[in-house]
């Protein structure tokens, strides 16, 4: 009974299924057990293999063990611990009784039996049991090679076999910590993978109760053809799928159809697919004589295909993960990239551009744009076999179809070029318009239709050698000169 009592006091290694419940443990196999007692200590040397079994089902095995009564229990060689909640394997382990702390070394493997088999592998692992003065248990993994964790969210245990929702988080880091039953922290070149999603940072934390993952310091996330990076990225899950991702401080996104830079970028998902992007910057300071200009203050910038937009906020709508609309608000400016019509033109008129309070850019699948043109030519013609109806959303290309710029009080402006008719290789005509609202319809990369409402003014300029079209503008070209692209 003496030996059984002493071992029972020592074998509280990890939090068992019934924490705090009394455990009676017995040495069931050992080659030799020798006791050395002094006036100040009592030590048991157990040569093995040493096997212990406890009344609650806990099992402990090691090649040998050293018990310092009331101080520590050291397990040496092929250490194995198992209770109903988890198992631990290591080459060496020491349990310190007063602090209720376990330290395991060399080839440590900690497996959670109750959570779909979550596993932590490391060269060094320290576990501190919950105590009256320490309400939460704490596990720390470190060492070289770096720790690796395979973590299954608890809700994934209800997923069907083979369901992608049951995919674990694969985590590598220099240092890992688990607090309680739901909080995970990692530092030092953190790399996280789950299915096709990859992410990384210098620091990471995951709160399973709140379903929230926070990546800090050089954070990045990749998913299929999408990459997001910032100082800090926070992801909110809904069950096992992404619901909301927010990137803060020097946020940058690169996608197949869109590239965005802003102080903050927020991505909204539905059923795991990106539906909406919102990019914002801090509000501009109050106007002053020496205040910042639109060029100097932080702006949100988006590049969608060949269209560059600059504004205080940018809202991109992508239902089904296909770009359909971008709304640029707040001193907005949009410019199309250089094309064949730009050759030989001054910078001021080399590219089509619009500016105003708000710009709405609408996109369609390239096949839809082609079919709409074909339908206009021959309404009775059947749709092409490879039209948008049969194209995969993730492989179809989108093109700019329409621009609407608004700015009451004549703050809407547009400058666009019109190519010559026929085979005339000369420079294009230039159309500059000021109004309250301007709509441009594009086809084949060129403006085909334009509509302006409100107090409409402007200029239509043709190169020398072309017949000038009469205009109704009352102001001179000098007074109606458009702003330079550098001011936006």
What positions do the PLM features span?
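Bacterial N-terminal signal peptides that target proteins for export
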Residues: 1-7
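Intrinsically disordered, low-complexity segments enriched in polar/charged small residues
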Residues: 7-9, 483
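Hydrophobic h-region of N-terminal signal peptides that target proteins for export
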Residues: 9-20
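N-terminal amphipathic/hydrophobic interface segments
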Residues: 20-488
């Amino acid at each position: 009974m003496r030996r059984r009592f002493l071992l029972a006091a020592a074998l509280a290694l990890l939090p068992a299924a019934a924490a705090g419940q009394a455990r009676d443990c017995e040495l069931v196999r050992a080659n030799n057990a020798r006791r050395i007692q002094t006036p100040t200590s009592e030590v048991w040397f157990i040569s093995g293999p040493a096997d212990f079994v406890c009344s609650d089902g806990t099992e402990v095995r090691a090649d040998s063990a050293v018990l310092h009564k009331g101080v520590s229990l050291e397990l040496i060689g092929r250490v194995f611990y198992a209770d109903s909640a988890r198992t631990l394997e290591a080459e060496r382990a020491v349990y310190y009784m007063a602090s209720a702390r376990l330290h395991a070394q060399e080839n440590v493997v900690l497996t959670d039996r109750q959570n779909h088999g979550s596993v932590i592998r490391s060269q060094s692992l320290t576990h501190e049991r919950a105590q009256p003065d320490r309400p939460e248990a704490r596990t720390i993994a470190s060492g070289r090679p770096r720790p690796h964790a395979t973590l299954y969210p608890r809700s994934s245990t209800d997923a069907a076999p083979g369901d992608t929702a049951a995919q674990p988080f694969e985590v590598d880091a220099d240092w890992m910590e688990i607090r309680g039953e739901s909080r995970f922290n990692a530092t030092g070149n953190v790399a996280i993978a789950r299915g096709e999603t990859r992410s990384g940072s210098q620091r990471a934390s995951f709160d399973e109760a709140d379903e929230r993952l926070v990546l800090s310091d050089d954070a990045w996330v990749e998913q299929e053809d999408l990459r997001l990076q910032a100082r800090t990225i926070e992801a909110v899950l809904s069950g096992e799928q992404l619901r909301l991702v927010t990137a803060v401080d020097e946020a940058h996104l690169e996608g197949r159809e869109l590239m965005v830079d802003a102080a903050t970028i927020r991505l909204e998902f539905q059923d795991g697919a990106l539906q909406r992007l919102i990019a914002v910057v801090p509000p501009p300071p109050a106007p002053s004589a020496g205040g910042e200009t639109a060029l100097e203050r932080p702006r949100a910038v988006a590049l969608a295909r060949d269209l560059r937009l600059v504004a205080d906020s940018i809202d991109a709508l992508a239902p089904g993960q296909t770009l359909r609309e971008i709304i640029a608000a707040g001193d907005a400016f949009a410019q199309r990239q250089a094309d064949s019509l730009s050759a030989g033109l001054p910078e001021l008129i080399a590219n089509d551009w619009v500016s105003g309070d708000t710009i709405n850019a609408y996109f369609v699948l390239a096949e839809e744009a082609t079919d709409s043109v074909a339908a206009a030519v021959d309404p009775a013609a059947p749709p092409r076999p490879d039209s948008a109806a049969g194209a995969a959303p993730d492989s179809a290309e989108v093109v700019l179809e329409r621009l609407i710029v608004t700015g009451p009080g004549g703050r809407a402006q547009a400058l666009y070029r019109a190519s010559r008719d026929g085979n005339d290789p000369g420079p294009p005509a230039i159309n500059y318009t000021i109004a309250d609202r301007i709509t441009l319809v594009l086809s084949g990369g060129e403006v085909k239709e334009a509509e302006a409402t409100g107090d409409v003014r402007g200029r239509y300029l043709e190169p020398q050698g072309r017949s000038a079209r009469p205009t109704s503008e009352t102001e001179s070209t000098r007074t109606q000169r458009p702003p330079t692209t550098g001011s936006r």
